[in-house]
Amino acid sequence: LEDSLDLVDMLVDSGIDFLHISCWDCFTPPTHHDDPRMVTEIFAERLANRLPLITCGAVWSTAQAQEVMDQGADLVAVARSAIGHADWASHLGDSGYEPQRPPFTAEHLLDEGLSEKFVDYMRAWQGFVV
C-alpha cells in the first residue's frame, strides 16, 4: 500500500487529471496494513483534494455509493453492479435502491444487453452466472 501511495504523489506531479482506484471491496480495510480505514479514505487523504478520486469495488446500492463518497471519493465507478443492471445509474435517485446481486441467470444478463460471448466469459467469475 505504501508503494501505491508514493506512486500517487508521482502521478499527481506528472499532471494526471484524476486517479481511479479499484478496491475490489470499498467496505473492507486493506489487508497487511495497520490502518483500519478503507482504501478510499487512505487515498483521499494522500490526494488532499489535489485532483478527483474515482473509486470502485462492490458498490451495489445507492446507500453504498453515498458511503464511498463519504469516504472521500469524488466519483463512484461500478462494474459488477452495472454488468447485472444496465440501468443501475438511473436508480441512484432512489435512496432505497438495492438491486439483485449475483448469481444472475444467463437469460437475465442477455436481457441486460450482454453478448453471449461476454456471458460465457462471466461464467468464469465464481458465483456470477448460474
Predicted feature locations:
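Flavin-dependent oxidoreductase catalytic cores
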Residues: 1-130
